[in-house]
C-alpha cells in the first residue's frame, strides 16, 4: 500500500511538472501572439521598430497582469521586480559590459571585413528611425523580454524545477528551460499556413547562451534588474555598433 501511494505521488508530481512546463510555454507564446494581433490593429505598415516597441510594451502589460491575477499569492517583488542585491548586480554588469563590448566589436568588425562590409541594417538611417531603433533596443526590449522570460516564465517554473545542475556554474532547470523558450522565441513562424519565416542558427545559439546568463543572474540576485540591464546593454551596444559601421561604410 505504501509503495502504491508513493508511486501515485511520483506520478502526480510528474504530471504537475508537465502541466507547469506547458503553462509556462503558453504564457510566452500566447502573450506574443496577442501582442502581435493588437499591434497589427494599430500599426500595420509602420516602421518596424515602432511596431516592435508597441508590441513589447503590450507584452509588459500582459505579463504583469498575469502576475497580479487573484490567487497567485505572490507580490511583484517575488516575481523579480525589485532592487535586491543591486550592488552585486552592478559589479557583474560592469564586467559583462566590458567583455561584451570588446568581444562583439572585434567579432563584428572581423566578420564584416571578411564578408565585404554588407549592410547591417535594412532601414534608412534618419534621425527619427535611429532614435526609435535605439530606444527599442536599449530600453524597451530588455524590460519587456526579461519580465516575460525571467519574470513570468521563470517564476512559473521555479517552484517545480528548482533542482540545480553545475556546468562550471550553478543554474536551476527552471533557468535552463526559460533560456530554451527564449531561444525558441527567436525563431520566426506563422501559424496559418504553418511555416518557418526566420531561422538563424547563430542568433538562436546566442539567444540561448545569453538566456542562460540572464537566468543565472536572476538566481544569483533574486532580481530582474541584472537581466534587464544586461539585455539592454547587449542589444543596445550592438545597435550603436551597427549604426556606426553602416554610416561609415554606406552613408545611410
Residue ranges and their predicted role:
Residues 10, 14, 18, 22, ...:
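Hydrophobic, aromatic-rich alpha-helical transmembrane segments
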Residues 14-74, 92, 123-128, 132:
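Alpha-helical transmembrane segments in multi-pass membrane proteins
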Residues 33, 37, 108, 112, ...:
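Transmembrane helix-loop junctions and nearby membrane-interface residues
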Residues 65-81, 144, 148-149, 153-154, ...:
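Cytoplasmic juxtamembrane interface segments
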Residues 130-252:
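Transmembrane helix-loop-helix hairpins at the membrane interface
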Amino acid at each position: 500500500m505504501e509503495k502504491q501511494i508513493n508511486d501515485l505521488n511520483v506520478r502526480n508530481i510528474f504530471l504537475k511538472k508537465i502541466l507547469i512546463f506547458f503553462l509556462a510555454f503558453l504564457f510566452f507564446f500566447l502573450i506574443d501572439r496577442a501582442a502581435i494581433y493588437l499591434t497589427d490593429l494599430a500599426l500595420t505598415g509602420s516602421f518596424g521598430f515602432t511596431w516592435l516597441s508597441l508590441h513589447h510594451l503590450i507584452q509588459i502589460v500582459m505579463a504583469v497582469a498575469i502576475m497580479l491575477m487573484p490567487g497567485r499569492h505572490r507580490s511583484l517583488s517575488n516575481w523579480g521586480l525589485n532592487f535586491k542585491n543591486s550592488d552585486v548586480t552592478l559589479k557583474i554588469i560592469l564586467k559583462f559590459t566590458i567583455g561584451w563590448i570588446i568581444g562583439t566589436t572585434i567579432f563584428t568588425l572581423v566578420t564584416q571585413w571578411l564578408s565585404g562590409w554588407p549592410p547591417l541594417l535594412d532601414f534608412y538611417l534618419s534621425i527619427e528611425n535611429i532614435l526609435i531603433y535605439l530606444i527599442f533596443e536599449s530600453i524597451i526590449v530588455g524590460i519587456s523580454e526579461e519580465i516575460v522570460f525571467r519574470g513570468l516564465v521563470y517564476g512559473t517554473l521555479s517552484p517545480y524545477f528548482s533542482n540545480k545542475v553545475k556546468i562550471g556554474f550553478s543554474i536551476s532547470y527552471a533557468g535552463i528551460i526559460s533560456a530554451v523558450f527564449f531561444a525558441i522565441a527567436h525563431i520566426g513562424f506563422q501559424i496559418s499556413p504553418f511555416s518557418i519565416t526566420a531561422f538563424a542558427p547563430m542568433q538562436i545559439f546566442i539567444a540561448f547562451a545569453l538566456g542562460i546568463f540572464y537566468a543565472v543572474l536572476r538566481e544569483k540576485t533574486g532580481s530582474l534588474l541584472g537581466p534587464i540591464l544586461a539585455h539592454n546593454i547587449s542589444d543596445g551596444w550592438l545597435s550603436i555598433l551597427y549604426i556606426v559601421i553602416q554610416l561609415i561604410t554606406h552613408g545611410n
